[in-house]
C-alpha cells in the first residue's frame, strides 16, 4: 500500500482586493520570503505546506486568487472546495476594507456553508499610512463571528499565527478517526459537521 | 865663550821684558796688575827688576822736581789771582742766587704754561699718528660694516663680493692689527655662513616648490584645457604663439635675474629698479606662485665659491627625492577624482618647475637629467594608475579619470615630454572601463527586472501612448486603432532595457573621445562592448530572474513576450550605433551585434522554466494522491486531488491567453506527458505491492478525467487527438487489464496494427504480479475458493506466457 506523507489535507483560500498582499502573505508563510515588487496574480495559484498540529501532520493546500474582477469566474470556482477562507484587506487602503462586505457575500454565495473564515488586515507595519483603525477590523469580525488578525507580510507579523489558528479551527471540526480505520479523503465527502465557532 | 854670548842675549831679552812690564804697570788698571806682577815673580829676575823700578822712580821724581821749580812763580801768581776770583765769585753767587730766586718767583706760571704746551704737543703727535692709522683702517671697517648689512638683509651674493674685496684688497694693508686678524679668521666662517644661508634659502625654495607643485600643476593643466578649448575653435597658430610667449617671459625673467646680480647693478643700486620692474610685470603660471630668485642666487654664490658641482649635485639629488615623493600616490587615490587630480597636479607642477629651471639657468639641470627623471616618473605614474584604476568600480569615475589623463598628457606634451605610453595605457583603461560599465549595467538591469511588475503597460491617453512609442520602437497598426484605455503587449522593462542599452552605447562612445581613434576603431569597440552587454550581462540578468526560486507563471509568460519584442528591436540598435559612429554597416570588418541570440536564449529558458514550473505544480498535486489500492468498492468519480489538478491546469491555460501559441501548446503537451508518466509510475512503483481490480477501476476514472481534459482543447491549435496521445500508454494498459483481453494481446503481440501496441510485456507482467498476490491473499474466503483457484490458474498461465514473450524478445 502506498504510504501517505500526511494525515489530513486542509484546503484554504485567500481572497480580497487586488494589491492588498494576498500573494505576499502566502509567500511569507510557505517560503518565508518577501518580494517588494507588486506582481499582479493572474488566475489562480497555490502553495502546499505541511504543519504539525496536535500530533497530526496536516497538509495545507493554500489557493491564492487574483483579486481583479476579470478573473472572478475562475476564482469563484475554487470557493466550493475550500475548508477555510482568509479575507484580506489593506489597512492603508480604505476601499479594500469597504469591499470586505462584498467578499463576504461571495463566500455566502459560492462556498460551503460550514467554511471557516478569518479576516486579515495586512500591511500593519505601515502605521504611518494607516487609514483603517484596528477597531474597525475587530468590529466587523465580531459582527460576523469570525477571527481577526492584523498582519504584515513584509515584517512577518502574525502570518504563521493566522494560518495555524485557522488550521486549528478546522481541525477542531474534523471528526476524530478511529485507529486502523480506513483513511478517508475529507474533501471528497460532504459530511463535515456544520457547527460554527464564535470568536471574540 | 859661547856661555858669555848666551848670557848677554838672555839679559837683553829680560831687559825688553822688564820694559814691557813697566809700561803695562804704567798703563793698566790696578785690577789687572796682579797677573803682571805674578809673571815677574814667576821668573828669576826679581832683584834686577826691583833695581830698574827704583831707577825709573828716581827719574820720575827728578822730572817732577824740575817742573815744579820752573813753574813756581806762575803758580804763586795764579794762587793770588784765584783768591781774588773767589771773592768775586762769592759776590756773583749771591747775585745769581737772588736773581734766581726772583726769576723763580716770577716765572712759576710760565713754567706751568710750558709744561702744558709740552703735553699738548705730545697729544697732537699722538693724535696725528692715530689719525694716520685710522685712515688706513677705516675702509676696512666700512667694508666690514657693509658686509654685515648685506648679510643682514640677505643679499648674499653682494655680500660675497664684498667679502672677496675685503680679503684681497683691504685687509692686507692693515694685517698687523689684532682686529684685522680677527676679521681674517672670521672670513672663512662668513663664507661658510653665506653658503649655509644660501643653502637654507634653497631648501626653503625646494619646500616652496614642493608645496606649490599642486597649484603650479593645476594652473598648467587649466591653461592646457583652455588651449584645447581654443583649438576647437581656431587654428593651431594660437597654440604655438602661446608657447613662444611663455618661453619669452621665462627668458625675460632670466635676463632680469642676471642683471640683478651683476656688480655694476649692485653698485648703482640697480636692485631696487629691477625689483620694481618685477612687481610691475604679470608672469603666468609658476612665476606667480614661486619666487625662483633663491635658486639663481644660490647657483651664482656656489659658482663664485667654486662649489657649483656640489650645488648641482645637491639640487638634483633633492629634486629626485621630491620626485619620488610626488610620484607616491595616496593610498585612497582611487576613491575620488580629486585624488587623481591632486596627484596629476603635483606631477605636472614638478616638471613645469624643472622645465623652467632648464630654460632659465646655465646647466643646473640638463635635458638628459630631465628626460631620465621623466622616464622614471612616467613608469611610476603608469604603474600607479594601473593599480589604482583597477579599484574603480564607478564607470563615471573611470570616464572622468580618462579625461583627466588625456589632459595630463596634453599638458606635459606642451612642455616637450613624450606621453605616448600614457595613451597606450588609456586603451587598457578603456577595457577596464568597459568592464566597469558592464558591472554598472548589470546592476541597472537587475534593478529594472526586479522592480518590473511583469504586466502589459497600460496607457489611458494618446500622450502616454506616444511617450511609450517614443521610448521603444514599437509599431502595431491594430493596437494604434484601439480605443483608450489599452495596453502594450510588453511590460515596463522593455522600453527601460532598450534605453539603457542606448545609454551604455553613449557611455562607451564617451570614453573614446580624445583618444585619437578612427571612426572604424570606435565603431568596432562599441559593437564589441555592446555584444558583451547583450550576450553576457543582460543575458545573465534575464537568466537570473528566470531561475529565481519563486518565479511565477505570470513573470515567465511576460518575459517570453518581452524578449520577443526586444529581439525585434536589435535592428534599431544597429542603426543607432551606425548613426553615432558614422560607420556604414557594410564597412569591411565591422563587428555585428549578436543581441538576437541573447533574447532567443532567454525566451527558451523562460519556456523551459514554464514547463518545469507546471510540472512541479503537478507533482505537488500528485503528492496529495490517496489511493486505497486494496479497495473492493467501485467508485463513480475521479479522485479529488486529480479533479483539482485538472481544474488548475484548465484555469491556468485559460488565463494565460497572451502566451504565444506554440509555447502554450508545448507547455500543455509537456504537462500532459508529465502527468501521464507520473501516473504510470504511481501505478508501477515498488511500494505498491498489491492492488485490486477495484483500485484499477478508480485509477481508470482518473485517467478518463485526464483524457477529458485533453479532448476539451484547453489550448487552441492542437490537432483533434494529438494531446490525447499523451495518455495512450495508460489507456491501453488499463483497457487490457480491465477487459482481461489477454487472448488478443498474446495473439497479436508483435503485429504492427495490434490493439495493445503500446503495452510493454514487462510492464504488463509487473502489474499482473501485483494482482496475483492479491488473489493468493484471498484464498481463505471459502465461498470463492473454486473461482479464485480458477482465476489464479489463469493468472499463472498468462504470467508464464508473458515471461515467454519477454525471453524470446530478448533473444
Swiss-Prot record, chain A:
Where are the S-geranylgeranyl cysteine lipid anchors?
199-200
SUPFAM superfamilies from the entry? P-loop containing nucleoside triphosphate hydrolases (SSF52540)
By what means is the activity of this protein regulated? Answer: Regulated by guanine nucleotide exchange factors (GEFs) DENND4C and RABIF which promote the exchange of bound GDP for free GTP. Regulated by GTPase activating proteins (GAPs) including TBC1D21 which increase the GTP hydrolysis activity. Inhibited by GDP dissociation inhibitors GDI1 and GDI2 which prevent Rab-GDP dissociation.
Chain positions of motif Switch 2: 64-81
Indicate the enzyme's highest-level EC class: hydrolase
Please list the residues that carry the modification N6-acetyllysine.
Answer: 102
Cite a GO CC annotation: secretory vesicle
UniProt superkingdom: Eukaryota
Question: Which keywords fit this entry according to its UniProt record?
Answer: Acetylation, Cell projection, Cytoplasm, Cytoplasmic vesicle, Cytoskeleton, Endoplasmic reticulum, Endosome, Golgi apparatus, GTP-binding, Hydrolase, Isopeptide bond, Lipoprotein, Lysosome, Membrane, Neurodegeneration, Nucleotide-binding, Phosphoprotein, Prenylation, Protein transport, Transport, Ubl conjugation
- Where does this chain mainly localize? membrane
Q: Which residues carry this modification: Phosphothreonine?
A: 73
EC number, as in UniProt: 3.6.5.2
Q: Carries keyword Endoplasmic reticulum?
A: yes
Q: In which residues does the motif Switch 1 occur?
A: 32-46
How does it get modified post-translation? Ubiquitinated upon Legionella pneumophila infection. Ubiquitination does not lead to proteasomal degradation. Phosphorylation of Thr-73 in the switch II region by LRRK2 prevents the association of dRAB regulatory proteins, including CHM, CHML and RAB GDP dissociation inhibitors GDI1 and GDI2. Phosphorylation of Thr-73 by LRRK2 is stimulated by RAB29 and RAB32. Phosphorylation by LRRK2 is required for localization to stressed lysosomes.
**Which residues does Mg(2+) bind?**
23, 41, 64
What would be an example GO MF term here? cadherin binding involved in cell-cell adhesion
Has the keyword Phosphoprotein been applied to this entry?
A: yes
Q: Where in the cell is it found?
A: Cytoplasmic vesicle membrane; Golgi apparatus membrane; Golgi apparatus, trans-Golgi network membrane; Endosome membrane
Q: Which reaction does it catalyse?
A: GTP + H2O = GDP + phosphate + H(+)
Family per similarity comment: Belongs to the small GTPase superfamily. Rab family.
Q: How does it assemble?
A: Interacts with MYO5A; mediates the transport to the plasma membrane of SLC2A4/GLUT4 storage vesicles. Interacts with GDI1 and with GDI2; negatively regulates RAB10 association with membranes and activation. Interacts (GDP-bound form) with LLGL1; the interaction is direct and promotes RAB10 association with membranes and activation through competition with the Rab inhibitor GDI1. Interacts with EXOC4; probably associates with the exocyst.
Free-text comment on this protein's domains from its UniProt entry: Switch 1, switch 2 and the interswitch regions are characteristic of Rab GTPases and mediate the interactions with Rab downstream effectors. The switch regions undergo conformational changes upon nucleotide binding which drives interaction with specific sets of effector proteins, with most effectors only binding to GTP-bound Rab.
Protein name (record): Ras-related protein Rab-10
What lineage, starting at the top, does this entry show?
A: Eukaryota, Metazoa, Chordata, Craniata, Vertebrata
Curated annotation (Swiss-Prot), chain B:
Return the Gene3D superfamilies for the record.
Dsl1p vesicle tethering complex, Tip20p subunit, domain D, Exocyst complex subunit Sec15 C-terminal domain, N-terminal subdomain
- GO process terms (BP): exocytosis; Golgi to plasma membrane transport; intracellular protein transport; membrane fission; mitotic cytokinesis; vesicle docking involved in exocytosis; vesicle tethering involved in exocytosis
Coiled-coil region: 50-119
- Protein's UniProt keywords contain Transport: yes
Q: Which Pfam families match?
A: EXOC6_Sec15_N, Sec15_C
Keyword Transport present in the record's keywords: the answer is yes
Q: Which parts of this chain are annotated as the region Disordered? A: 260-280
Q: Which GO terms describe its cellular component?
A: exocyst
Q: What domain of life is recorded for the organism? A: Eukaryota
Q: Where are the transmembrane segments?
A: none
For this UniProt record, the keywords arranged alphabetically read as follows: Coiled coil, Disease variant, Dwarfism, Exocytosis, Protein transport, Transport
Quaternary context = The exocyst complex is composed of SEC3, SEC5, SEC6, SEC8, SEC10, SEC15, EXO70 and EXO84.
Q: What job does the chain carry out?
A: Component of the exocyst complex involved in the docking of exocytic vesicles with fusion sites on the plasma membrane.
Family that this chain belongs to: Belongs to the SEC15 family.
Linked disorder reads:
Spondyloepimetaphyseal dysplasia with joint laxity, 3: An autosomal recessive bone disease characterized by multiple joint dislocations at birth, severe joint laxity, scoliosis, gracile metacarpals and metatarsals, delayed bone age and poorly ossified carpal and tarsal bones.
Give the protein name, as stated in the record. Exocyst complex component 6B
Q: Read off the lineage from the record.
A: Eukaryota, Metazoa, Chordata, Craniata, Vertebrata
